[in-house]
Regions:
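Short alpha-helix
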Residues: 175-191
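Class I SAM-dependent methyltransferase SAM/SAH-binding core
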Residues: 43, 49-98, 131
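Conserved class I S-adenosyl-L-methionine
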Residues: 1-40, 51, 72-75, 82-84, 145-174
Length: 277
């Protein structure tokens, strides 16, 4: 479903430089919501390699993990093999735009950095977002939760020290990520009531690897952030040349620190939580 990344290839390296940012927010939301449910069934829509599913599995009764890419799904199955034996989790190959589930069968649906992959970024209408969220509304029980974990425009500009090195990709990403106000309006139009917007200020997508100033020189490091897939080869080469120049001059560490300074105020991701009316 992704319009810009080959996840069959990326799945081989994804978990080397990627962690589930904001897990504590997700766990808290699900734990509070399940208090009113004797059994709690969660859909991980666009589960990728299963990082978020692994994190929240102890807090729900059952997870259905779905992804359109067989490579990502294979990694998730391997990662969660022990849980599968206890029937806590089931895996499905399918699209978030047409979910292979009956209506009103889930207590929560989570989209973790998925919806931007449904857009070309050219018309500004975000039909991919709307289609997926409408499907979430369909498969949720009354009062069920949808959690959208995505990147805001200010976070794109200031939350990643290296993105300014690939301006074409940064611009393309900006057009694919829905503005917060538009997302909240869309949720309301689709029959959801917004319950909150949360930003994990200390979360890092790449964990400790984020501070590897020479990371952009390595393809496997870049595979942990699909934004690099939107950069033309010439732009990647230019970014690599800049990193090497700074390394040679001894200025690479200060350069990273300078361009990372605002991340502590804006974070790298935003969680939107809404309830089906």
């Amino acid at each position: 479903m992704s319009t810009y990344e080959n996840y069959s290839e990326a799945s081989k390296h994804y978990d080397k430089t990627r962690v589930p940012v904001g897990g504590e927010i997700l766990i808290g939301v699900l734990a509070l919501s399940r208090k009113s449910r004797s059994e709690f069934r969660l859909l991980d829509a666009g589960c990728g390699t299963g990082a978020y599913a692994a994190l929240v599995l102890p807090y729900v009764d059952h997870i259905d993990a779905m992804d359109i890419n067989p490579g990502m799904l294979a990694v998730a199955r391997e990662k969660l093999a022990d849980a599968t034996s206890g029937a806590n989790i089931a895996f499905h190959e399918g699209s978030v735009a047409s979910m292979p589930f009956e209506a009103a069968c889930f207590d929560a649906v989570m989209f973790n950095h998925v919806l931007n992959h449904l857009e070309s970024g050219q018309d500004g209408n975000f039909y991919g977002h709307r289609t997926a969220l409408a499907e979430a509304h369909r498969v949720l029980r009354s009062g069920g939760l949808v959690v959208v974990n995505c990147i805001g425009h200010e976070q794109l500009r200031h939350g990643y020290w290296y993105l300014h090195l690939i301006p074409t990709a940064l611009s393309a990403c900006h057009d694919r990520f829905i503005p917060a106000e538009k997302l909240e309006a869309m949720l309301s139009e689709l029959g959801f009531a917004l319950e909150g917007r949360f930003v994990p200020l200390d979360g890092l997508f790449q964990g400790a690897a984020y501070f590897d100033a020479e990371g952009p020189l390595r393809p496997e490091w870049r595979k942990g952030d699909s934004n690099w897939a939107l950069a033309p080869e010439q732009e990647i080469s230019s970014a690599e040349a800049k990193i090497r120049e700074l390394r040679t001059s001894g200025d690479l560490g200060p350069y990273l620190a300078e361009h990372d300074a605002k991340r502590r105020q804006v974070g790298q991701a935003t969680f939107f939580v809404a309830r089906k009316i």
